[in-house]
Curated annotation (Swiss-Prot):
Higher taxonomy: Archaea, Methanobacteriati, Methanobacteriota, Stenosarchaea group, Methanomicrobia
Function: Probably deamidates glutamine residues to glutamate on methyl-accepting chemotaxis receptors (MCPs), playing an important role in chemotaxis.
Family designation: Belongs to the CheD family.
Keyword Hydrolase: yes
Protein name: Probable chemoreceptor glutamine deamidase CheD
Name of encoding gene: cheD
EC number(s) reported in the record: 3.5.1.44
Length: 151
């Protein structure tokens, strides 16, 4: 799954996304129904976009759309758990820290929707590959020159 995309699945499916640098992946998961999804966002807010036809490209609208899709599947919002990954500082320009802004917008949007963040692996200066296991809600995080991590 690529940048600006969203996927939703029930157990036992695994959803994988590559090339996570300053982008942020937000997962939402319902343990009771064993349904989850992730959105791979590139920019903080759709309000900054001139053309608003790609909601999954933006952190705020991506979270909103993913939550709506899980609600349509019958999961109540009170059972959602969120995890955040990414938001790395990939560029030298300190004024252009898109990753940090993506993390901030993700946290603010999840707080607005009263969805708890139960785990995160954010920031730093390296890329990540993520796999969501819808059987457990676990996120496998792979990075170059670092051990695999499960959150």
């Amino acid at each position: 799954m690529g940048i600006g995309a969203c996927a939703l699945a029930r157990s036992p499916v695994k959803i994988k996304t590559f090339g996570l640098g300053s982008c942020v992946v937000i997962t939402l998961y319902d343990r009771q129904e064993r349904i989850g999804g992730l959105v791979h966002t590139m920019l903080p807010s759709i309000s900054d976009a001139r053309i608003k036809d790609k909601p999954f490209k933006y952190t705020d609208s991506g979270i909103e759309h993913l939550a709506t899709e899980i609600l349509r599947e019958g999961s109540p919002r009170k059972r959602f758990e969120a995890k955040l990954v990414g938001g790395a500082h990939m560029f030298e320009n300190r004024n252009l820290n898109i990753g940090e802004r993506n993390i901030k917008y993700a946290k603010n949007t999840l707080e607005k929707f009263e969805i708890p963040i139960i785990s995160e692996d954010t920031g730093k200066n390296y890329g990540r590959t993520i796999t969501l296991d819808t059987s457990t809600g676990d996120l496998l995080i792979r990075t170059i020159l670092r051990a695999d991590k499960i959150i």
